[in-house]
Amino acid sequence: MFRVLIPSRKLVPGCGGFMGGIARIQAYSTKKDKSEEIFKTKIQQREKEAQQKLPEWTKRDEAIRNRYGEWNPTHRLSRQQIQDIRNIKDKMPHMKTIELANHFKISPEAIRRILKSTWVPSDSEEERIRLRGEKRKDESLVHKKEMMNDIELARKRLTYGKSVTMGGINVPRSGGRKGKNLRNTFSTDGKVNFDSNNSHGYYNRKGKTKAFKRKPYVENVGDIID
């Protein structure tokens, strides 16, 4: 960058004279500094040399990562789906990895690992895998059944005001609230039905007068004067 100072003359209106001054002009060079270009060239050369010194397995992993992306599985596939991927590749070898990944909705790296693997379970291992799958299925059904029972007990507690046991913890009744005060609050499927236009019926009981006991008649001073 360089600066240039140029004398300037401006016409003064009204008197016909001139007013002197100095005009400052700043100019910027569009060419890059040679030292900056030399520094960038040295950095690129060192990175290239370091890349060449890496072992072959590191270069191979880097190439696979650049081609298929990072190894980040989104969900697990079943044994049958894994076998289907291998069968499709055997019958249609022209099918690309990215096409299989889009069909099964997983990453291309997962497809590459499945096709590269040659492990085949034996008969005993298949039986063990089958039993483990059945056990997990039974445990899931029991867990869902217990959860539905807890929801039903909570619904009854809110409806009838009774203490129930949920997950081994005894939950006491809440203030003696009666079932008629919470009618139609819960539906048959356990969901809450809340009506904002009729919410006063559950809380302050608007529209109902307070019951009071009638007192016996007693003569006062006005009756005696009359």
From Swiss-Prot:
Residues 1-25 form a transit peptide. The keyword Mitochondrion applies. Its main location: mitochondrion. The keyword Mitochondrion applies. Keywords: Mitochondrion, Transit peptide. Transmembrane segments: none annotated. GO terms for cellular component: mitochondrion; nucleus. It is found in: Mitochondrion. Belongs to the RRG9 family. Required for respiratory activity and maintenance and expression of the mitochondrial genome. This is Required for respiratory growth protein 9, mitochondrial. The lineage of its organism: Eukaryota, Fungi, Dikarya, Ascomycota, Saccharomycotina.
